[in-house]
Amino acid sequence: MGAGLPCGGAGHRILIENSEYWLRNYGDLAMLDVTVRRIRTRWPLATVGVMTESPALVAAYFPGVLGITVGSRDPWGAPGRVERLAAAVGPAVAGPPAVAALRARAWLLPRAVRVRDRLRDLRSRGSSTDEPQPAPEPSHAEILAPRIERRHPGAARAVREASLVVALGGGYLTDADIPQAGRVLDLLEYACGVGVPAAMVGQGIGPLRDPELRERATQALGKLPLIALRERRRGPELLESLGVPSSSVVVTGDDAIELAQNVRKVSPGNDIGVCLRVAKYSPVAARAQEIVGATLRAAAAEFDARLVPLIIAETPGSPDRATTLPLVRGSANPVEPVGSFVRPAAVAAQVGRCRILVTGAYHLAVFALSQGIPVVGLTSTEYYDDKFLGLADMFGGGVRLVHLDDPELSEHLPAAIRAAWAEADDVRAALRARADEQVLGSRNAFERLFGLLERTHTEHA
């Protein structure tokens, strides 16, 4: 990568809008890991901040990086005692108490908000009996800045005092995750409004049909000089329909590929990796879960392979551990899953011991394909169809899609597993080569990203 800013970026602040504020998804952590390392390599003296609900977990996973909450009073201030301790002991020790605090806050916060709103209603009823006069409808721009500054003062100040804002990769710009999509779009548009360079990397966009969300995306995305996409099957056309100039769009592949690339093994594995994602955005009937488990256990016996339960998400809404471990019970000698607070490279390395992967989780497929391992993708929604088909397109194959609501699931899933097993040796080199190409494309996009700040610095020098 290029020379970077003078003095190694000292005095500059890079704000990362993280795609998962609890840091409980190893795919998101992998993208964050790659992004932080690239920024530190380019600008070793710059200050890096990550939007989060747990500054302690940010410090545990990334010592020296600031965790910034939406309510931070001094977002770029020095880390506190808890964060310094978390950085010293790491995620395995800091993780359990940090998540306990997050869960307690998640339970208390909505109740506190309801009490506040009731008190506000009571005060407003007693304050005046006059009929309120209709006010002119304010524009979106007039609403956005005051709303962010009032509701999320820490985020607003972090943006205003940043040198560059980067929205981390993810699949959140979609109808399946409207609250998070709105949060990210607001932050990016606010950054543009206060004159701070902003960009998006590693994005998987869509399906996006909600009229309100499309309008918000049109307003925000068209202002960005760079949007890097992880797939080309849907994203470029969707962005074009939103009025985003093609000159701002580049297809790179997923940024997490680089992390998996770095843990590749010389020899192929002989195990079957498995993860079943069951969530509101990925519903799976109980009968389908039973069929998946029985099929996997039969495949392990047929190929004399061990089943490897793989965990990518440990969020309350996507508890992969709870939905995956039952699938391997009853199989001969299953592999132990990773612990609850490991680093993403440990998950990618465990994927590397497999000959094939059967997964309902997107980033496990990224980890597998990047190491030359074919994938059977389990899907029940258009959202996951797009994710897996986008990967198949970027890697030139290596993915077989199986629909969990298919009436013939008990026939189609075993056939897909056998086909993936049979082709594993033949596709290994080609999949790895496609992964290497995508890493290069991702790094080139980061060169453009770095240029946003470096050009601004030169112009104002």
Placement of each model-derived feature along the sequence:
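Active-site anion-handling motifs in enzyme catalytic cores
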Residues: 1-461
